[in-house]
């Protein structure tokens, strides 16, 4: 055994200069064009390969293509028919670095552009992909090996980095700036020397060194030494944001030196204008030109210096079908879905955006369109998961086809006001193309509105409550154990909703940590996901393409760990308004801004609130109007303490108060307000201010006479205490008892 160890150490201590010279020799041979192939060329509309061996060429850079071992791991349907010139340059640069055996680091603005470019390159070169979305919860075991218990025995399972190294795949690491700084150094040696020690005792070594040892000692000795060959095709592509412009951890200098970096930028103005004109032929070209000019202005360094968030350029392309279907929308209507600047900018920032809008003659187009309503909703006869919707815009009726479920639901606890009708129609337009985020104050009716939307479209709703300490595993897969003690992965409600075509409601987007939320970006943008147990979720288009190319059934693909995201799946996030500026409560970052289309939901007016509460609770009398008058006085107060008290009197809370007043109409307004606001626990100053507001509105404390003759009586399964009665629950004889 000592001889084996001596031999391993001997070969591992070969002169570094010799190994480096051999490596550079191979790189120079590749650069000098040692490929002996016939002629080939690259076109922006198609790729032409030679008959002897498939080769792809971009300009003067060429790469021989290999048949993938697992074609289901190669990205599909990302390459457009006509590739823009700027994208061709980026692909050429990536091919150069790939040919040199170098790892790549793509920097750029928040959004899916860097990931899209990576998947285009992998599809072009027919490379298999291992994808890891990094977050603050990522650990060393998520990259190397994870220990699982099967049949009472611990086993080490290779994770993405190890699988990619052994199988010659491309490891894509997205979110480099989010991971803890002590995690990525475990990949240092793998990036630099293609070596890595594994927890199960194996050692990964470079292909050249492995082949040399194999030729000298044979496969049996290599297996005994537990040496594993890192494929020469193994590459790493890291995707990240430039820090410190964006929040996150900068790369350590040793790790940074392992990559060749490139800044990925959006297409130039002229090329983008051609794209959006082709996507929205029903919209005036001049209007599209002004919209694009405005969005490019918000991406300049001057705008960044003013504290303005980057405009989500990819969402502009995603949302253009809305404008094309309903050209009566104003430009401001269209822009506010992608860039709700009034939600997250202070007054100075709002003025800067409005001045920019005025520069491009956008704000002069008018305010948001008022007359917007849903005329009819009907099931599609061709597709059970499609819904035909007619929306009235002004005096015209426009037809849309949107995703929907197959359930038949009726909303009995929703009161529609003119404002709700307009907002529902506006949200439905965004639902036709993208996922949505509804932002509004606490208790204003966001959840009720979404439930009504789900009932209208026939969705089954899966609500996911978000919280501050929520991890990436809570969002995707949770680790649990079986009755026998084996470790298994349990799908999260969000993933189940994606597989079953449900409406996933992310309630409390403002609470969850921004780094944890980043793991679902690929699901939002691409409808694809890679889970911790190795399962891969693909969009409907990519899944059906694989079925056709590989001639496999749905069940056979699922047997390979490939599952389809249901085409009707949608996400609606609910959040409270962020604090303006860059404070602690500013949850709306450029990354989150690029994930959804946004809708601002205001609190109901006093008249609207009275209508809703009266119809839902049937509360008569003058108590409720007095209550609402006090509530709106608190909400509109200039005193921050009173406004914070007003949050306890949301529409949701007022509905509870209305139901209580229906059963106990003799209760005074003063008592109801104090109970709802928990006035007994308020600071003395806030309590005195609240009393002054109540007194100003003519509401005073009413002294009640305590009845000392209250009796407690139980008769016929009814409990009576004074004037209050409640039915008792009859305990069944078959219920188990826990006492002797």
Language model regions located:
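Conserved alpha-helical scaffold flanking the Walker A/P-loop in AAA+ ATPase domains
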Residues: 95-96, 150-171, 220-228, 482-504, ...
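A short helix-turn-beta junction within AAA+ P-loop NTPase domains corresponding to the substrate/partner-engaging
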Residues: 127, 189, 232, 248-267, ...
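Loop/turn-to-beta-strand initiation segments
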Residues: 102, 167-171, 231-237, 434, ...
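Walker A/P-loop
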Residues: 103-134, 435-465, 740
């Amino acid at each position: 055994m000592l001889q084996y160890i001596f031999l391993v150490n001997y070969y591992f201590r070969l002169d570094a200069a010799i190994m480096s010279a051999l490596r550079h020799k191979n790189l120079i041979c590749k650069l000098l064009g040692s490929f002996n192939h016939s002629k080939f060329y690259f076109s922006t509309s198609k790729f032409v390969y030679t008959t002897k061996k498939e080769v792809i060429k971009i300009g003067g850079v060429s790469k021989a293509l290999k048949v993938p071992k697992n074609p289901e791991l190669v990205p599909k349907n990302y390459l457009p028919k006509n590739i823009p010139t700027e994208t061709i340059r980026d692909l050429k640069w990536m091919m150069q670095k790939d040919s040199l055996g170098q790892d790549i680091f793509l920097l750029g603005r928040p959004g899916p552009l860097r990931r899209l470019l990576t998947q285009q390159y992998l599809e072009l070169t027919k490379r298999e992909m291992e994808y890891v979305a990094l977050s603050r919860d990522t650990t060393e075991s998520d990259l190397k090996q994870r220990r699982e218990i099967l049949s009472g025995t611990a086993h080490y399972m290779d994770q993405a980095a190890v699988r990619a190294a052994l199988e010659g795949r491309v490891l894509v690491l997205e979110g480099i700036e989010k991971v803890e700084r002590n995690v990525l150094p475990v990949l240092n040696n793998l990036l630099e020397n293609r070596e890595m020690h594994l927890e199960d005792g194996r050692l990964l070594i470079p292909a050249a060194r492995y082949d040399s040892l194999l030729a000298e000692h044979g496969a049996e000795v290599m297996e005994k030494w537990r040496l594993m060959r890192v494929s020469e095709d193994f590459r790493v592509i890291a995707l990240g944001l430039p820090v410190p412009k964006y929040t996150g951890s900068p790369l350590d200098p040793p790790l940074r030196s392992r990559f060749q970096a490139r800044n990925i930028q959006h297409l130039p103005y002229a090329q983008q204008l051609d794209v959006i004109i082709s996507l929205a032929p029903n919209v005036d070209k001049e209007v599209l030109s002004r919209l694009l000019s405005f969005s490019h202005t918000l991406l300049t360094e001057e705008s960044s210096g003013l504290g303005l968030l980057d405009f989500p350029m990819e969402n502009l392309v995603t949302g253009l079908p809305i404008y094309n279907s309903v050209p009566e929308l104003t430009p401001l209507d269209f822009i506010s879905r992608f860039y709700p600047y009034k939600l997250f900018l202070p007054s100075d920032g709002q003025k800067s955006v409005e001045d920019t809008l005025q520069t491009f003659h956008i704000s002069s187009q008018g305010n948001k369109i008022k007359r917007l309503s849903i005329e009819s909703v009907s099931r599609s006869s061709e597709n059970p998961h499609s819904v035909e919707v007619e929306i009235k815009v002004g005096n015209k009726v426009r037809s849309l086809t949107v995703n929907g479920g197959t359930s038949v639901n009726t909303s009995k606890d929703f009161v529609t006001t003119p404002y709700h009708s307009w907002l529902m129609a506006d949200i439905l337009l965004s639902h036709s193309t993208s996922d949505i985020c509804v932002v509004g104050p606490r208790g204003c009716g966001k959840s009720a509105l979404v439930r009504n939307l789900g009932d209208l479209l026939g969705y089954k709703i899966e609500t996911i409550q978000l919280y501050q300490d929520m991890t990436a595993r809570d969002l995707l897969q949770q680790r649990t154990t079986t009755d026998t003690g084996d470790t298994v992965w349990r799908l999260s409600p969000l993933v189940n909703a994606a597989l079953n075509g449900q409406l996933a409601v992310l309630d409390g987007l403002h609470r969850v940590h921004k780094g944890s939320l980043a793991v679902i970006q690929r699901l939002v943008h691409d409808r694809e996901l890679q889970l911790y147990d190795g399962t891969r979720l693909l969009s409907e288009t990519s899944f059906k393409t694989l079925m056709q190319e590989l001639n496999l059934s749905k069940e056979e693909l699922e047997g390979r760990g490939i599952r389809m995201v249901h085409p009707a799946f949608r996400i609606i996030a609910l959040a409270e308004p962020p604090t303006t500026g860059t404070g602690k409560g500013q949850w709306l970052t450029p990354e989150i801004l690029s994930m959804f289309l946004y809708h601002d939901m205001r609190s109901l007016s006093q008249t609207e609130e009275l209508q809703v509460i009266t119809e839902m609770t049937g509360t008569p009398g003058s108590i409720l109007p007095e209550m609402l008058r006090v509530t709106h006085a608190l909400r509109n107060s200039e005193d921050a303490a009173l406004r914070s008290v007003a949050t306890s009197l949301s529409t949701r809370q007022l509905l509870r108060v209305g139901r209580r007043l229906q059963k106990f109409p003799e209760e005074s307004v003063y008592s109801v307000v104090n109970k709802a606001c928990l006035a007994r626990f308020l600071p003395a100053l806030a309590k005195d201010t609240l009393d002054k507001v109540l007194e100003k509105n003519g509401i005073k404390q009413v002294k009640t006479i305590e009845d000392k003759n209250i009796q407690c009586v139980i008769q016929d399964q009814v409990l009576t205490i004074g004037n209050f009665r409640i039915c008792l629950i009859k305990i069944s004889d078959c219920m188990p008892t826990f006492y002797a």
